């Protein structure tokens, strides 16, 4: 399934956005199943504790560090962000996260028995969001925005993806199909039956040219 938003109708009349390969800090393959976790904002503190229970490698310990604090501790307490930085440093020091040697794009597919969707993983720039080249697709609240800003500053990394929709291009689809024929970096099946598969594009140049 290709994701297309209503904003796609005037895509070609809007300023071109920049989308680049990047040097990823990603899960070591042998630990990927333990590290994989739901997005921080779809589980509450109690649920995140259940995910992280007896699993020191659960990434919610980085993305939702308030799980390690008493319920009376506000999620935006400075100590919570310090804990995020500590856990992120631990994940790197233990070798649970590894740094790629060069910039690349990645293909991410999510699927179950009834549906599937794909996305190319890369980096965009904040100035494109500010200029309107990237259109907002929802109204967000100030408090959660401030929380993620502080979290990003604390760990000096993006702990989760920002999802963008675009009209699509058959040339990009062909490159994605080619990548899917290769060996994936990760193939994880969650208890709910959803399969998460990620491939590394062996060459970034063709995609970089198409994305501009």
Task: Specify the residue positions occupied by each region the protein language model found.
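A cross-family signal for N-terminal binding/gating loops and helix N-caps
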Residues: 2-212
């Amino acid at each position: 399934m290709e994701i297309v938003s209503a904003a796609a109708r005037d895509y070609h009349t809007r300023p071109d956005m920049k989308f680049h390969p990047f040097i990823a800090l990603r899960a070591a393959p042998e630990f990927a199943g333990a590290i994989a976790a739901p997005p921080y904002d779809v589980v509450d503190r109690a649920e995140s504790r259940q995910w992280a229970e007896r699993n020191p490698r659960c990434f919610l310990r980085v993305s939702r560090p308030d799980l390690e604090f008493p319920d009376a501790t506000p999620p935006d307490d400075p100590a919570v962000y310090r804990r995020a930085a500590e856990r992120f440093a631990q994940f790197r020091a233990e070798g649970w996260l590894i740094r790629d040697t060069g910039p690349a794009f990645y293909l991410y597919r999510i699927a179950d028995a009834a549906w599937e969707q794909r996305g190319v993983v890369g980096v965009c720039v904040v100035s494109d969001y500010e200029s309107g080249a990237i259109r907002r697709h929802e109204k967000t609240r100030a408090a959660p925005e401030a929380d993620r800003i502080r979290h990003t500053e604390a760990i000096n990394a993006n702990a989760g993806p920002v999802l963008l929709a675009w009209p699509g291009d058959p040339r990009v689809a062909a490159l994605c199909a080619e990548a899917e024929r290769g060996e994936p970096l990760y193939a994880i099946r969650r208890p709910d039956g959803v399969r998460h598969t990620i491939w590394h594009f062996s060459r970034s140049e063709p995609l970089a040219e198409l994305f501009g």
